Amino acid sequence: MEKIKMTTPLVEMDGDEMTRILWKMIKDELILPFVDLKSEYYDLGLPYRDQTNDQVTIDSAEAAKKYGVAVKCATITPNAQRMDEYKLHKMWKSPNGTIRSIMDGTVFRAPITIPSIHPCVKNWEKPITIARHAYGDVYKSVELRADEPGTAKLVFEGKSGKKQEIEIHSFDGAGVIQGMHNTDKSIRSFAHSCFKFAIDTKQDLWFATKDTISKTYDAQFRKIFEEVYESDYKKKFAELGIEYFYTLIDDAVARVIRSKGGFIWACKNYDGDVMSDMLSTAFGSLAMMTSVLVSPDGKYEYEAAHGTVTRHYYRYLKGEDTSTNPMATIFAWSGALRKRGELDGIKELQEFGDQLEAACFDTLNDGIATKDLVNLMEGVEAKAVNSAGFIAAIRERLEKRLG
């Protein structure tokens, strides 16, 4: 069979630990035999990030902006223990955070659903995608402990010399104070990414804040979303028959639980942090969650939503058998190749992405799975295999599908 040709390179970001092992297995077994892979490779493994003073992370993000589509392996964000383990000379920042900042992107996470794994919420029939605004709010806040009676004030000093001041609270004893912010530019970028992704995936978009209580802060989010929708996307949404819907965050939670799924739920930073974990667990497994970073100007970076699977990696180093779930990493590859094919007008590459995912579903529907999924599967006689066995089973079914 002739390999599928590519015209534009895919930006490939390698990673760490067990996911790095899976990365090579997936490439060798499921990509390279079928695709004449054209990629620009960046090693984001922690040792090389340390060696390059993290310049490789910056370079990879700039390449993603240049070429438009990237696929990323899970990476370690170092802490004190990792600094010692890897003999690092600095505690480097999260690669995802660096890439997200450079691409000015929004993270969209969605579950991979199969008939034999039922969501905890019985009426969910389709995946629910979480769009999390990954800038500001409590994550960029400053905090102060007040240890005596006094007055806390919010002060803004404009460059023009104009000064605004408002009392937060008059303390008659000890307490805590927090100040947080966001920017119109960041909120607007978030809105554009959400509307574009909704059009791209032909799904309704929900957005929720608490603007009845937060009449300036949250209200600005709502206002900007409405402005962006009315000026840039309303007509296209109508053409596609999809809807933009705003509601309060508490009402949104109730509606999500009652829904059948099949939409994008845009959330502020904290709400998205919490709700993405709730959704991944309710749908079955974090190992079955896809993640794509989308910039406002339509650049894409695909990855798995999970980490580097450290525990399995240590067992792998000891020569022990591991049954690590590669599904989310495979779907990162399939999503990136499909998008590359779509942008370059290569139908065969788009179809390959579809067929690769279908081969994964065929394998699971035949009861062949990694250990983490076996206990979750119902209505099928499931057999646990190791990572290599699972990938081999997918390849066998992929070859059948490709003829």
Predicted regions and their residues:
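Glycine-rich phosphate/diphosphate-binding loop of Rossmann-like nucleotide-binding domains
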Residues: 6-25, 29, 154-247
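A structured beta-alpha segment of the ubiquitous adenosine-cofactor-binding alpha/beta core
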Residues: 49-62, 233-262
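Flexible, glycine/charged-enriched surface loops at secondary-structure junctions
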Residues: 35-41, 201-209, 233-246, 341-353, ...
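Internal helix-turn-beta structural module
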Residues: 318-324, 342-403
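N-terminal glycine-rich phosphate/adenylate-binding segment common to multiple enzyme folds
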Residues: 47-159, 163, 270-274
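Glycine-rich phosphate/nucleotide-binding loop
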Residues: 256-355, 362-366
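N-terminal alpha-helical transmembrane segments of multi-pass membrane transport
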Residues: 2-8, 18, 22-23, 28-53, ...
